[in-house]
Amino acid sequence: MKRHIALIPAAGSGRRFGGKQAKQYQLIDGKPILFHTLERLNKSFFQSIYVVGKKDSFDFASFKKDYESFFPGVIFLPLGGEERSDTVQKAVFYLFQQNKVFSQDWLWVHDAVRCLIQEKWLQTLKQVVEEKNHSAILASKVTDTVKKAEPDKLVIATTIQRDDLYLAQTPQVFPAGVLAQALEGDRTGARDEAMLVEKLGQPVELVSVSYTHLTLPTSDLV
């Protein structure tokens, strides 16, 4: 049976969010954003959930100490790297080495700060990957007018047709073996895991969701 395993990279600094503390550890309603994200995923269908933070992170250690008891099935891995792709690579390779994941399993990579994920979207994404038998990601259709600037100045070069444009979101779901293969290659310039899988020539399905799933980019939104 193909299992569904969630991987949450939580080693980022969240510089765009502002403040000294990484945004996944900042509070909403008295709890860290990561807590709310885990609360959503932990109620869903996942056989295993892994949170990956930095070994020397005080915030990661404090979160584990304070909230681990709320999520007894969640496993915290101190394997975080400097970049997101480093964190995901180290975690995926570790899970394979420890026989915690196998090539046929589905690996879900979900941003720690995307705490607005809805169960209906998880279920839809699960249905799509199981029916199509290949990778898929959540994505929001671009609805704003998009302008491209000149390379060296803030002057409009052209207006981009938005009909086929989507904003990549998470979760991003992959056959574990495909993701591991993608992470073995050149990760330079890769914005997300889907981009790495694209480089392999593998199909990645888009599952359209609303803008309400977008991350929290600035501190004045909470």
Q: Which residues does each PLM region occupy?
A:
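Conserved core of the sugar-phosphate nucleotidyltransferase
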Residues: 116-207
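Short beta-strand segments
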Residues: 7-11, 52, 110, 138-141, ...
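Conserved N-terminal catalytic core of the sugar/cofactor nucleotidyltransferase
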Residues: 34-104
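Residue-level signal for inorganic ion chemistry
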Residues: 8, 34, 91, 111, ...
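Short aromatic/hydrophobic "clamp" motif used to bind/position activated sugar donors
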Residues: 107
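Conserved small/polar residues in nucleotide/adenosyl-binding loops
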Residues: 212-218
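N-terminal glycine-rich phosphate-binding loop and ensuing alpha1 helix
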Residues: 2-58
